[in-house]
Amino acid sequence: MGQKVHPIGMRVGIIRDWDAKWYAEKEYADYLHEDLAIRKFIQKELADAAVSTIEIERAVNKVNVSLHTAKPGMVIGKGGANVDALRAQLNKLTGKQVHINIVEIKSPDLDAHLVGENIARQLEQRVAFRRAQKQAIQRTMRAGAKGIKTQVSGRLNGADIARSEGYSEGTVPLHTLRADIDYAWEEADTTYGKLGVKVWIYRGEILPARKNTKGGK
């Protein structure tokens, strides 16, 4: 039975960049655990702020954190109060100077993490899993996606035996490395246990820049 490789991990270094941009030798393990603590803390504090990607860059005793969010106003707060409080908490957590950069996501319906999160929240509110998936697919295709695939797994409708059910529209070429495919998985806590939600979104091809081989001509 064929297994699927992680679509983002497969494309890192080809058309995707790393979410953590730093180099270390002896401190590698410490930095890695610090990164995990930063991500976990931000995801907990900003659970309702539609934060998708968290990028971390490091310099000497300085950490730059870029938050990609569909709700920048909620992250910043009135007069910057929320982001200042978050910065102070991260400074205390890491013992380093943390700089926070906020990047607005212009099209949240083309972000797999946000689409998956939306489906998961609907499932927690007892929306039918088929309806939640089909509505998400329609919104994503209207937003300009070339294709989308969703899958919900677990005790669907409270069934005794867990199963998976998914829907797709358009094309999702997982083997094409130049294909810009966003992938995410989320969990929904329901009265019957956890449901897993997976989302693949194909946003078009990213062609590498053409190299000039004729000496500047």
UniProtKB/Swiss-Prot annotation:
Free-text function comment from the UniProt entry: Binds the lower part of the 30S subunit head. Binds mRNA in the 70S ribosome, positioning it for translation.
Subunit organization: Part of the 30S ribosomal subunit. Forms a tight complex with proteins S10 and S14.
Boundaries of every KH type-2 domain copy: 29-97
Keyword Zinc-finger: no
Source organism of this protein record: Streptococcus mutans serotype c (strain ATCC 700610 / UA159)
Keyword Heme: no
A Pfam family matched in the record: KH_2
Name of the featured protein: Small ribosomal subunit protein uS3
Any Gene Ontology CC annotation: cytosolic small ribosomal subunit
Protein family per UniProt: Belongs to the universal ribosomal protein uS3 family.
Coiled coil location: none
Keywords, sorted A to Z: Ribonucleoprotein, Ribosomal protein, RNA-binding, rRNA-binding
